[in-house]
């Protein structure tokens, strides 16, 4: 009987510990999601400006990206440099720390109505890498590169007409301000 009580007691301790861990994880994850939803810029790069790599391909417009980078530079968000023709071995890498990588998407990577999508990797509140995936040809649309670089810099959507970070393309504009 003593061995059974010991096993039963260990089982209760294990379940209580597991329950506490799951509860703590859930509360932490919920707090992180709430922070992301409520913040205009929940994450940012550290003091080293990111490097932008064109892994989309040679048909990506260098002029369009340079214009988009300039849009953010005049607002105080810097890029280390832009590499229009990086080596293929670099483009084969995923989640390169310190880089914003531009890629051509395929029909499985983007929803039907999505022109481009930016994914950020973070450590704490610091962005470590970002990847912008474009629907083929959408990089030529006015302001799309500026908008996606905004996400790569850590900004979320702002549902105010004329704002560069508006989620709907037809309501996007050249304006940038931090919402109240």
Predicted regions and their residues:
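Short, structured coil/loop segments at alpha-helix boundaries
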Residues: 54-62, 87, 141, 176-179
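Metzincin-family zinc-dependent endopeptidase catalytic domain
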Residues: 62-148, 152, 156
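Metalloprotease/metallohydrolase-associated module, dominated by Zn2+-dependent proteases
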Residues: 2, 24, 28-32, 117-140, ...
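N-terminal Lys/Arg-rich, disordered targeting/topogenic segments
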Residues: 1-10
């Amino acid at each position: 009987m003593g061995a059974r009580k010991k096993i039963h007691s260990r089982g209760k301790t294990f379940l209580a510990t597991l329950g506490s861990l799951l509860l703590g994880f859930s509360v932490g994850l919920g707090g992180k999601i709430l922070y992301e939803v409520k913040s205009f810029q929940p994450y940012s790069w550290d003091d080293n400006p990111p490097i932008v790599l064109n892994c989309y391909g040679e048909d990506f417009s260098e002029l369009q990206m340079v214009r988009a980078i300039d849009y953010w530079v005049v607002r105080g968000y810097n890029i280390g440099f832009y590499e229009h023709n990086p080596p293929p071995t670099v483009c084969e890498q995923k989640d390169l720390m310190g880089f914003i990588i531009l890629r051509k998407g395929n029909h499985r990577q983007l929803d039907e109505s999505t022109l481009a999508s930016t994914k950020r990797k973070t450590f704490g509140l610091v962005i470590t890498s970002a990847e912008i995936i474009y629907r083929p040809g959408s990089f030529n649309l006015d302001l799309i590169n500026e908008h996606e670089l905004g996400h790569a810099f850590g900004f979320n959507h702002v549902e105010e007409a004329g704002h560069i970070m508006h989620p709907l393309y037809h309501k996007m504009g050249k304006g940038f301000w931090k919402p109240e």
